[in-house]
Amino acid sequence: MVGMTSAQHFDLVIIGTGSGNSIPSPEFDDKSIAIIEKGTFGGTCLNVGCIPTKMYVYAADVALAAREATRLGLSAHVDAVDWDGIVERVFHNRIDQIARGGEEYRRGEETPNITVFDQHARFIGPKTLQAGDDIITGDNIVIATGSSPVLPEPYASSSVPVHTNEDIMRLEKQPRSLIVVGGGYIAMEFAHVFDGLGTEVTVVNRSEKFLRFLDEDLSSRFNDIARERFDVRIGTATALEETADGVRLTLDSGDVVEAEAILVATGRQPNGDQMDLSTSGIEMHEDGRIKVDEFGRTTCEGVWALGDVSSPYMLKHVANAEQRAVQHNLLHPEDLRPMPHEHIPAAIFTHPQIATVGLTEAQAREEGYDVTVKVQNFGDVAYGWAMEDSTGICKLVADRATGKLLGAHIMGPQASTLIQQLITAMVYDLDIREFARSQYWIHPALPEVVENAVLGLEWQE
């Protein structure tokens, strides 16, 4: 290979600097480590995903609270949105500094055993990588390259500027109007962000229902709220054109939608398809995920994978948990620890917030459980009165015979916080029949909605 350097060998090679970057703890100080990152240090979550989006969500929440203040007897309004100020606060003052600091640390004197390569990595043989002009081999290789937005047609081949979550937050100016394509959590969060900040939002989805994976009670209520809040169009795009003022989208339903900008949030795909994995004997699932066993091992001995590139759960807290398992397994090959894939929660930072863990009611019935179900309204507890909440619910699904909590589903203020105590109940297999009365619940605080939901479950005599 002309121009190639001789192979450099390392004890450990890590591809990707999201969760994978947390593997080199002090226990690895005696190991030679290569970190390969073609993009920005920190991965999706830090740079273009969960963290900056929630910083935008919080600003939108505050703006929306002012809009809805009349129900509390207040007259409030947002005079203006300083888009440049938000971008500077989120990225220049926070995210970019953290990403830059992370790279400087890995390249610096504090980690002399680590070498950083800033090129795209691909396999050219078993446990052998090419990154730019460098050939890199390793005793162990960890693939933690994450995922990327999916752009279906006609967006993928269009010359019209199409935005994804990876650039929408860094727009030079806030659009007066925005088309959001998609019906999943990314689409719904950004629809909330831009509508909350005053952009006119049109949501385009190919099916009638948003967030279809949710329990039916939450899904139906959220869809009612979304349809009241956003201009919703159902259909699949047949044409995308650039106009003098922005974009024009034509749907197979005949609808034509125009806006200053368009965001496509129709899903994500694992970043394993451009790494020539087959040259190393690494197999993939049909959906593009790298095949791993319960310990994170791929089909090539000594090669591991974690996070979005291999996991069925595209969630940062899952990637972090998988990273801890792989980290342990690298250090203790005689005592392998499985990936922790039980009781995985998820939250959606829309308005209202949504959080869920475990089985939906339909799933529990399909699995043959004799279920007991309670749907508790936020508006029926004291703090719900204080907020004048009329949409929030806490739904619990339990096994009537054993008191085992099978699923918890919350939609309303602070849902992502309220769900945590129910995750604990499931992880430690607590008898939910004793859960409400074996502890104090602060009155009149919002967790009383969970207490009342538990007390409302009906049990076998």
Where are these regions (language model features)?
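Hydrophobic Val/Ile/Leu positions in short beta-strands of Rossmann-like dinucleotide-binding domains
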Residues: I14, I35, I179-V181, A187, ...
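Glycine-rich dinucleotide-binding loop and its adjacent helix/turn
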Residues: C50, T145-E200, V204, V232, ...
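FAD-site-proximal beta/loop scaffold in flavoenzymes
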Residues: S159-P175, V256-P333
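Core beta-strand elements of the Rossmann-like FAD/NAD(P) dinucleotide-binding domain
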Residues: A7-F10, A131-N140, D252-A261, G272, ...
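A Rossmann-like FAD-binding core segment of flavoenzymes
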Residues: T115-D118, R122-Q130, L197-E294, L359, ...
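Flexible, glycine-rich terminal cap/loop adjacent to redox cofactors
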Residues: F10-G39, T44, I51, M55-A65, ...
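Short hydrophobic core segments
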Residues: V13-I15, A121-R122, I136-G146, V180-V181, ...
